[in-house]
Amino acid sequence: MQRAEPQEFSRVLSSMCTEPHPAAREAAERFLATNPGDPGTYETVSKLEREAVDMLGEVAGLPDAAGYIASGGTEANIQAVRIARNRADTRTPNFVAPASAHFSFRKAADILGVELRTAPLEDYRANLDGVAELIDSDTALVVGVAGTTEYGRVDPIPALADMAADAGALCHVDAAWGGFVLPFTEHAWDFDDADIHTMTIDPHKMGQAAVPAGGLLARGPELLDELAIDTPYLESTSQVTLTGTRSGAGVASAAAVMDELWRDGYRQQYETAQTNAHWLAAEVESRGFDVVDPVLPIVAMDLPYDLVADLRERGWRLSRTEADEARIVCMPHVTRSMLEEFLTDLDRLA
């Protein structure tokens, strides 16, 4: 059988995952054979999961956080909608999310039979008037995004939380990517800033954990109780997670890397990434291309379709926004020298 080699990150510019930190790699290898879905049997990894959730709570301004390490942001977003649906006192629940929300919310609506109402944007953020027009007595959840996938924008989270409260709905924040950069900014986004109920925050993105290591946080355990089912043949009696068997490697890597990097390591990582994003935006703009201001370390640029195709032929992994801009995410593996090499190819091909 031919031996397959993992893809190098040397030309990966659009991914929101990155090379795991050495501490994450080592921990993941040690816990490959463990299953936090059976905490009675795998007690050590269960304790590590509790530590990981506690640290995620510290990152997101939530002491004594409830939650668990999920497969990724999609699972966490689905679970947040599921909590809201199960808690709602209506037979026809809906939830409101901005047009910038991740496509996983469309999956959630389809799987759970909950109507998704999509609010318009203003300067790439949720338009509050548009959200208000969509909320009614059947609204179970209002979603805000803290670090949008395409542009890195942060919705007005406190205002969205207030609107949810007025409607008797829950408020969920999707900070899958932004959660490990926003603590070092002035944005209001977390449990300490607003009366939000649940949050998606992924260690395997800017947290540098090994995949799979997403995160779901809840303000209290009673919210997770909405997800509980009996597990009669396990040593534990109930389960709130979406999947049964889960990756102990992901859990261990998340706990290890957060212990290693929070807080100063992540601060330095953010400052480097943000500096690189601003530098890249200025360089691309100086070449005559329109660029969306990188509020967080994501650069969207109006490169012609054929030029992006040529860059991809040279091995650069670039994605495009819905508006057809090229998009670069300044992840920890995206160095200044890597960006300089990208610009060299851009100049040759433009």
UniProtKB/Swiss-Prot annotation:
Stored InterPro entries: GrpII_AminoAcid_Decarb (IPR050477), MfnA (IPR020931), PyrdxlP-dep_de-COase (IPR002129), PyrdxlP-dep_Trfase (IPR015424), PyrdxlP-dep_Trfase_major (IPR015421), PyrdxlP-dep_Trfase_small (IPR015422)
Residue list for modification N6-(pyridoxal phosphate)lysine: K205
GO biological process: one example: carboxylic acid metabolic process
GO MF terms, alphabetically ordered: aspartate 1-decarboxylase activity; pyridoxal phosphate binding
Keywords (A to Z) from UniProt: Decarboxylase, Lyase, Pyridoxal phosphate
Family of this protein: Belongs to the group II decarboxylase family. MfnA subfamily.
This protein's name: Probable L-aspartate decarboxylase
Species, as recorded: Natronomonas pharaonis (strain ATCC 35678 / DSM 2160 / CIP 103997 / JCM 8858 / NBRC 14720 / NCIMB 2260 / Gabara)
Gene name of the encoded protein: mfnA
